[in-house]
Amino acid sequence: MAALLALAGAACWGVGDFCGGLASRRTAVLVVLAISQGVGLAGVLVWALVSNDGFPGVVPLLPAVAGGTAGVLGLAALYRGFAVGAIGIVAPISAAWPIAPLAVDATRGIVPNMLQWLGIGLVLVGVVALSLEGAAAGGSRLSAGAGLALLAALGFGGFIIGLDAGADESANWAVVAARAASVTLAVLVALLTSTSLRPQSRRVLPLIVACGLFDTGANVLVAVASNRIPVGVVAVLGALYPVLTVVLARIVLGERLSRGKRVGGAVALAGAALVASG
């Protein structure tokens, strides 16, 4: 059940990040971040209140605050990468973020079984295959935005570690704390840089709202899952979000899916199945 929650979170992340990346091509990244994070904060706050989830106190939520800060920096890098590079390439590279949570699990003495290790290996191989773009002259190259995608991976790794630590007593309030931190940071940056948070067009607002709702929903699902299975396993399953992002980029934007990308996606999904079954 926990593995399914993590996979559902990956699906929500995939949709949310596609919406956020598409919106970032039409208005400033900071605008997308501030509004989407604000929408997500409002949504999860209402959910925490109506679910009668008791507030655990400030101190237990501090790791989630740190995680939220790392996460919004990761999202900023990801959306900027989407704006300057191909979504179908940038998204898979950013999925390297499970390395940090797996390392944290190792320090706790939590080691996946052999079947899960095999699945983790397949997921990573699939992600690498998705991340390589065939050059016209032959060979492979990393697309524009790859450096930003790597920064995004670092931010996402820090986010899931902080969220896991802050969700011990309440997953919902941990996400509230993380979202509050990300909204605060985005607004502060806007104030310091005198950046208007008004979108360039009202037509982009539905994309931004959808981004915030899907992204925050994913965070809640992943936070609940991390309370039931090791955070490293949750991270590996959550890292499958680029598969849906790539598919949406193909359907909506017409981005070409090479044979390597199709094989990479299939390998990653097979690996996720092994991780979940283990």
Enumerate the predicted regions with their spans.
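Hydrophobic alpha-helical transmembrane segments in multi-pass integral membrane proteins
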Residues: V44-G54, P101-Q116, L154-N172, F214-G232, ...
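Hydrophobic core positions of alpha-helical segments in small-molecule transporters
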Residues: A8, I35, A66, I93, ...
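Alpha-helical transmembrane segments of compact multi-pass small-molecule transporters, enriched
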Residues: G38-V44, I93-A106, A181-L185, A218-V222, ...
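Membrane-interface interhelical linkers
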Residues: M1-A11, C19-G20, S24-L30, I35-A66, ...
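Juxtamembrane C-cap of transmembrane helices in multi-pass membrane transport proteins
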Residues: V15-T27, A76-G85, I93, A106-T107, ...
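Hydrophobic transmembrane alpha-helices of multi-pass small-molecule transport proteins
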Residues: V39, A100, L115-E133, G260-S277
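Juxtamembrane helix-start motifs in multi-pass secondary transporters
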Residues: V32-L33, A174-V175, V234
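C-terminal transmembrane-helix exit sites in multi-pass transporters
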Residues: L78, W97-L118, V128, V189-T193, ...
